[in-house]
């Protein structure tokens, strides 16, 4: 089953290759640019690409637009694919913003300031855009932004809640990019890394009206007991609200979601069927603590093995979404590694199953692993490697535990980013 899981992963990642997703929606002929169902005859065409898939997305845009492209800016994570000319490329930090992220925001604002009536701005957004583009308000600064970002990531807040905060301490997020691009027409192609594929959440809503408010930000701080830096508190008290639905800035805006979690999950399910497993695409909306998500999957596996409900083996349970980790210890890991380790512990000694959990960008948390691949024998292998799995969970040290059990998954930078992918294969009845 481990080999089957690796084949399923390869197929799922190929389905979300960013160049393919852009190419399906963008083309040009003569002076006309076609995006989805819309057609434009712009004076000039510029591209702003930001996110962990920005390199291949920009490359695909260059191929589609040809000489129609007037210029562009591409913001990438270090080690990721760079775009061709005429793009200016800036390498920025992720998951923590850095000086490159600040420089990228400055260059993006300069690009926006140069737009005129009759121009078309194509914005290519993928996961990671929020950190890669550090458009922090001038009264906050990078260091306090990094403190805020780190506190939110450690708190266990869901990505949508984190983005709610980011929008209100930024100059481009929360729809402000579109406001600054006026009077040009803005078309955004969005490779979604958020549950539900809502444009106002992708990249912290760079190109969408913001339905969240300053009061929502305060609720996030209270719910997760986050104490923001004083500069953030002062900024929020200044009532810096984002543009809302109905604002005139969005009259010349088109958002198109070109791919997301369902794309990879569906491809994984179909590949599983091809390999002889009846697939159940359970949900692409699973969020929350990785341990709780793992417990749900463990319960489903036990039910299938004991009662053949909701379907009999051989079968595949496929889910997507974005899990989080509440940091309690000082170890290494990420949500998918924590999911995999928790699942292995809960199903220890049970045969006839194998599971894969990965971050589709190839980097789970701040580690070099994409996630984990575990079976009923993984916990025993971890112990043989000298690591106590329960203690590793207490210390949030899933990386080293899975490493000890030879259960880490490495893909390298995949070039895409469409949330988490989890696949559990079940081959037959359990035996202890």
Region spans (language model):
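Short beta-strand segments
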Residues: 48-50, 73-76, 123-127, 188-194, ...
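A glycine- and small-aliphatic-rich helix-loop capping segment at beta-alpha/alpha-beta transitions
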Residues: 60-69, 86-89, 109, 136-147, ...
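Internal gly/pro-rich beta-alpha loop/helix module
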Residues: 138-230, 238
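Active-site cofactor/substrate anionic-group-binding motifs, chiefly glycine-
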Residues: 52-53, 57-81
């Amino acid at each position: 089953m481990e080999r089957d899981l690796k084949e399923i992963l390869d197929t799922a990642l190929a389905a979300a290759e960013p160049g393919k997703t852009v190419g399906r929606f963008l083309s040009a002929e003569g002076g006309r640019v076609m995006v989805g169902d819309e057609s434009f005859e712009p004076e000039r065409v510029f591209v702003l690409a930001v996110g962990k898939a920005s390199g291949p997305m920009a490359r695909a845009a260059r191929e589609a637009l040809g000489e129609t492209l007037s210029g562009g800016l591409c913001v990438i994570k270090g080690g990721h694919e760079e775009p061709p000319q005429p793009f200016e490329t800036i390498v920025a930090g992720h998951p923590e913003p850095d000086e490159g992220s600040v420089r990228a925001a400055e260059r993006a604002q300069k690009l926006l300031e140069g737009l005129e009536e009759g121009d078309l701005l194509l914005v290519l957004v993928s996961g990671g855009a929020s950190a890669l583009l550090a458009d922090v308000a001038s009264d906050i600064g990078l260091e306090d932004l990094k403190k805020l970002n780190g506190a939110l990531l450690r708190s266990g807040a869901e990505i949508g809640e984190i983005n709610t905060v980011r929008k209100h301490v930024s100059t481009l997020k929360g729809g402000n990019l579109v406001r600054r691009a006026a009077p040009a027409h803005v078309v955004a192609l969005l490779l979604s890394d958020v549950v539900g594929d809502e444009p106002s959440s992708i990249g912290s809503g760079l190109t969408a009206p913001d339905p969240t408010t300053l009061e929502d930000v305060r609720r996030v701080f209270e719910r997760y007991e986050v104490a923001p830096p004083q500069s953030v508190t002062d900024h929020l008290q200044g009532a810096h609200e984002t543009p809302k639905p109905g604002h005139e800035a969005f009259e010349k805006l088109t958002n198109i979601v070109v791919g997301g979690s369902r794309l990879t999950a569906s491809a994984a399910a179909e590949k599983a069927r091809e390999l002889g497993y009846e697939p159940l695409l359970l949900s692409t909306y699973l969020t929350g603590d990785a341990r709780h998500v793992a417990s749900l999957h463990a319960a489903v596996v036990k039910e299938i093995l004991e009662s053949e409900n909701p379907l009999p083996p051989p079968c595949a349970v496929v889910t997507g979404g974005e899990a989080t980790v509440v940091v309690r210890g000082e170890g290494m890991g990420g949500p998918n590694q924590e999911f995999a380790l928790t699942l292995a512990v809960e199903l220890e000694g049970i045969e006839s199953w194998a599971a894969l959990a990965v971050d589709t960008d190839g980097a789970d948390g701040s580690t070099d692993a994409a996630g984990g691949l575990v079976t009923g024998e993984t916990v025993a292998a971890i112990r043989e490697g000298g690591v106590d799995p329960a203690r590793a969970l207490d210390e949030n040290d899933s990386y080293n535990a899975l490493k000890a059990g030879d259960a880490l998954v490495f893909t390298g930078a995949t070039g895409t980013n469409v949330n988490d992918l989890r696949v559990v294969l079940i081959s037959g009845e359990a035996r202890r």
